[in-house]
């Protein structure tokens, strides 16, 4: 692959390094193949291996972390937003669900997508599945953790994040916007 190496120094002392090796995944698309890191002057160690990327845009589909843990990603909303992160599963495990979830994310019924994402979580009991939905052109709408607890994101009429609620409807965070008058 083609490496990109970043080294960090403080007062002339090497704190660490990161090497990202790029690969041509087809059609001239260069995307990461490996990420290696080190602390101080120790040798670089492989931390992430990219097993599969989307050849149309370079989004990671399956990566393997140090220790062998596989993490898969399903991209929706015309492959622009992450809709599912699946830890402890391979692409072969998630592939049967991918096209349907992507199609549902392009529809207008968010609840149908949420139900399908929850079905993915149920279908992969040994995986940790985190799912996401979005309000197009606004921002994230829901995040559901591996236990199935959903946080919802609420926006004001200007598309600004107003508050975040937990699964019980409790407000976790709130944003207030104040304007200064101009003189």
What positions do the PLM features span?
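Beta-strand elements of repeat-based all-beta scaffolds
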Residues: 1-65, 69-145, 150-183
């Amino acid at each position: 692959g083609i490496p990109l190496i970043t080294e960090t120094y403080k007062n002339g002392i090497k704190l660490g390094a990161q090497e990202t090796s790029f690969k041509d995944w087809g059609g001239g698309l260069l995307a990461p193949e490996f990420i290696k890191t080190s602390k101080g002057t120790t040798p670089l160690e492989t931390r992430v291996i990219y097993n599969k990327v989307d050849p149309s845009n370079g989004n990671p589909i399956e990566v393997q972390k140090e220790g062998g843990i596989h993490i898969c990603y399903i991209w929706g909303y015309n492959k622009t937003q992450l809709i599912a992160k699946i830890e402890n599963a391979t692409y072969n495990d998630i592939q049967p669900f991918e096209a349907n979830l992507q199609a549902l994310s392009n529809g207008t019924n968010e609840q149908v997508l949420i139900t399908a994402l929850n079905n993915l979580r149920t279908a992969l009991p040994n995986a940790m599945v985190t799912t996401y939905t979005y309000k197009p052109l606004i921002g994230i709408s829901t995040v559901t953790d591996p236990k199935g607890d959903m946080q919802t994101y609420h926006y004001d009429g200007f598309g600004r994040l107003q508050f975040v609620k937990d699964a019980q409807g409790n407000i976790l965070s709130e944003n207030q916007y104040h304007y200064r008058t101009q003189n």
